[in-house]
Amino acid sequence: MEFKLHSKYKPTGDQPQAIEQLVKGFKEGNQFETLLGVTGSGKTFTMANVIAALNKPTLIISHNKTLAGQLYGEMKEFFPENAVEYFVSYYDYYQPEAYVPQSDTYIAKDSSVNDEIDKLRLSATAALTERKDVIVVASVSCIYGLGSPDEWTGMSISLRPGQERDRDDLARALIDLQYTRNDMDFHRGTFRVHGDVLDIFPANADDTAIRVEFFGDEIDRIVEVDVLTGEVKCSLEHTMIFPASHYVVSQEKINEACLNIEKELDERVKYFKGEDKLIEAQRIAERTNFDIEMMRETGFCSGIENYTRHLNFAKPGEPPMTLIDFFPDDFLIIVDESHITIPQIGGMYAGDRSRKTTLVDYGFRLPSALDNRPLNFEEFEGKIDQMLFVSATPNKYENEHELLRAEQIIRPTGLLDPEISVRPVEGQIDDLVSEVNKETANHHKVLITTLTKRMAEDLTNYMAELGIRVKYLHSDIDTLERAEIIRDLRLDVFDVLVGINLLREGLDIPEITLVAILDADKEGFLRSETSLIQTIGRAARNSEGHVIMYADKITDSMRVAIDETKRRRKVQEEYNEAHGITPQTIQKSVRDLIAISKKVAADENALDKDPESMSKKELEKHIADIEKKMKKAAAELNFEAAAEYRDKLIMLKNTLRDIR
């Protein structure tokens, strides 16, 4: 099936030529290309058009869950007839296994798995197995080890009416796929049996179960049923049941792998005893033998991913299997915000190895556990077929590898890159206060970026004393509160937002008319050309947007950022003049910005009820309501809201236990 792009808009401005250039280059065999798109130029729409034109499976990698969620939502709207999937870390909370030798402290792995994301991850690999028209939006967790695609696909169960297969045989096969039988509580990853009928709730399904009806030792009929109502939706001529976990292996292979694990264990115990490390020898023997026994008995154990090398029969040091291995050979990778995402991919391997090496050295894990890891950067490069970098500020890696660069400088709204002025550091605060007063008198908003937390706090306090409505956005503020602060700025609760490194990607506030950059001439990460261009972009959503840099000299980074902004502005002005376009400030509803926080705020009263004053019955009902809201928030990918509900749920359940 081909990709079918649905949109009420047609490509405009620079989009048509950018799409044409990129598609032509990839069809001619280019491996690396770059889309340089300024803030607000419609890069996501261009990406969608490129995917539709190339018509090949696509992996979009984003540098965080929130942005991945936004892209996932947009791509689902663009491609409603195709498989758009979401693959990020399924942990709401994750404390990795670790050991601190200095204090002899072992920290066991502790995690809370988000059931909804687990389903979406399984759905992504199922879609890649069954069809070609697949877009997977992922975070960098896509480079972490996953089970073998061949094993996962090979163990899947194919069912057809007329197939010779008895009910008990199918039940045993489902257990091998890590499904559990539960005739009372039917949920994702379970099956139930009633006479000659076996119902399966696929691990990658939402609200649809598969009902298999038998006549003797033959499948008589297969239907889809609504889990809630039991209503038959449709009959099926064929269905595939995929494993309930990515770490699924046949019992035969598990038994063989256990023999290899025992060999490695013997070698490790001998090594520790030879080094007179008797505690480590005893520790590794006890822990590993327990895991081996669990795998032989149940086909699974806690931390089974640490034995991935043995379960996949891979050689020491071989690259792990990842989500990328589920894609066919001919596929496209799009790296969103590549100037951040590429370095992030490069940094994953070293941090993971450092922690695991300590566990191995002190007898908590076998050396083979080091192969349960993310890809290193060279291995990641080895899996690239074709790659599109997307960024407003491509970095060194993109510059060195791209064979083609398409620029998207024209905004559909006609908005120009802001004008920039450079002013001396001496007297910068008084000058800034004067500029802030001018902007706020016209009901405009201001962003100020400083270099240090101390300066941000002092500036915020000073302005507040002068009667300016100001708030400070710092790194200790969580995602929900951050969204609320931005909402308050847009709703005119205050006028000036001060921050350090939080004013760059993803902070698009159309009401901003002034961005002030203090100490712009202090070379470093926060004042690099990339950071400066991204910060300048925050003023590009308003037709009156402008930027003031406070500096005593023009650094190389400042010069590049200023020259690039001037170049873009000139191109934009010429285009607007030629086409009779008047720049229009972006109109964006405040509700769009705070969807996450509203999930919690919508029922603030319910959350704030005093559980101590409730009867047992009221408390049980309240718990059920909160649990429902938590699952709904998770289903809508509002994970911060879901976490808030989860914390409330724990508290309420503790209160209920005390009442009992």
From Swiss-Prot:
Q: Name one GO biological process term.
A: nucleotide-excision repair
Assembly and oligomerization: Forms a heterotetramer with UvrA during the search for lesions. Interacts with UvrC in an incision complex.
Chain sites annotated for binding ATP: G37, V38, T39, G40, S41, G42, K43, T44
Species lineage, top-down? Bacteria, Bacillati, Bacillota, Clostridia, Lachnospirales
Q: Principal place where this protein is found?
A: cytoplasm
Helicase C-terminal domain segment(s): 428-594
Q: Show the domain comment.
A: The beta-hairpin motif is involved in DNA binding.
- The protein's name in its UniProt record: UvrABC system protein B
Q: Name one Pfam family in it.
A: ResIII
Which ranges carry the UVR domain? 620-655
Q: Which UniProt keywords apply?
A: ATP-binding, Cytoplasm, DNA damage, DNA excision, DNA repair, Excision nuclease, Helicase, Hydrolase, Nucleotide-binding, SOS response
Looking up SUPFAM superfamilies in the UniProt record yields: C-terminal UvrC-binding domain of UvrB (SSF46600), P-loop containing nucleoside triphosphate hydrolases (SSF52540)
Does the keyword Membrane belong to this entry? no
Similarity section: Belongs to the UvrB family.
Q: Which GO terms describe its molecular function?
A: ATP binding; ATP hydrolysis activity; DNA binding; excinuclease ABC activity; helicase activity
Please give the InterPro entries that the UniProt record associates with this protein.
Answer: Helicase/UvrB_N, Helicase_ATP-bd, Helicase_C-like, P-loop_NTPase, UVR_dom, UVR_dom_sf, UvrB, UvrB_inter
Q: Motif Beta-hairpin in this chain: where?
A: 90-113
Using the record's annotation, list all stretches that form the Helicase ATP-binding domain.
24-177
